[in-house]
Amino acid sequence: MKTSDTSARPVSPPIEGRTGGVSYFTIPELTSSATAQREGIDNCPPKCAYHLLHVLVDQLLDPIREAWGEPIVVSSGYRCKELNALVGGVKNSHHMLGCAADLIAGNKADHRRLFKLIQQMQQEGKIRFTQLIWGGAKGAPLATTEGLSSQRSVACDSNGRWIHISYVPSDLRCQVIGE
């Protein structure tokens, strides 16, 4: 995947959510893609993916952001099939379902702290997820698992770090890869 500059990506302040709670993320944040814009790709999610993006926010992103207490940038959320292929995503990517987000949380220490916080929240029964993946520098070897490449890069912070998290309602295995 291509590394993108996330400095221009919007970071949402809290807004009133759909379920009466607070939502820190918007659907436009989760579907925005500089690559799609540049390449003229329509990255609008179908209705089923739109619904799953709301589930992702409600079940994972908002609780994580609330516990974190600071802004978290979504560097990659929903990807249509064409965009996913263009950026080098795996063929069975949860991003194409609207079930995944790649997160950026500052420097390496912040990333490590956020990754550990997400694990702690899962261990305490506060959240469940499908996969939590520690992403390394562009082109750096990552932990290999079924469906993941061992040489993969994604939209990341200036130091090449990202955290992938997914929520597939029928597959909450809480798989942790890396760190």
Features from the language model and the residues they span:
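Acidic, His- and aromatic-enriched active-site or binding-groove loops in soluble protein domains
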Residues: K91-R113
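Catalytic micro-motifs at enzyme active sites that drive phosphoryl/nucleotidyl and oxygen chemistry
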Residues: G88-S93, Q151-A155
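Catalytic cores and adjacent binding grooves of peptidoglycan-active enzymes
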Residues: S4, A105-E179
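Extracytoplasmic cell-surface/polysaccharide-interacting catalytic and binding patches
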Residues: M1-R65, V168-E179
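Amphipathic alpha-helical interface surfaces
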Residues: L56-L60, L83, C99, D110, ...
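Extended, low-complexity, intrinsically disordered C-terminal regulatory tails
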Residues: D58-G88
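A broad, low-specificity signal marking well-ordered, structured residues that form hydrophobic/aromatic
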Residues: I72, A101, I163
